[in-house]
Amino acid sequence: MTLTALTDWTNILNECIVSIPAVLTVPTPQNIGKLIVILNQLLAFAQAGFLNQQQQADLTSIIKNLITILTISPLNFIVLTNELQTLVNNLLSLINLFVIDNTTRQVQTQLIQNIILPLAQLGPTGATGLQGSTGATGLQGSTGATGLQG
């Protein structure tokens, strides 16, 4: 992999680290559009000839799925996060195929892992319902053992 290609790859990953949390927390058309632009950059990278035909087909399919998911309204976060996880898994497997030194590989792996951190930190954010009524009192337990005599 050339230094220019590695720089492009790193820039795309860094943009994903910023853009994905933005879409997940504030899914505005602007944030979604920015992520689609980044995914198209990743698509161009995938088709630049660094990957074999099968790897290129797999990554292209995942990216196109993500772009499709992002263009459907309302945004389905479950489907989006599942496909983002698929993307991260694919990127992690690809980084091991790049001809780069181990230090660079570790840095790239960390960048890819940082893409998935926002997904792991997501929790339910919707309104909660009313608290249910208190349950019935349970049966009384058996009497405990007698203590030591003083």
Roles of regions detected by a PLM:
Residues 120-150:
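Collagen/collagen-like triple-helix recognition
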Residues 1-41:
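Extreme N-terminal targeting and regulatory segments of eukaryotic proteins
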Residues 5, 17-27, 48-127:
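Alpha-helical bundle protein-protein interaction modules that mediate dimerization/oligomerization
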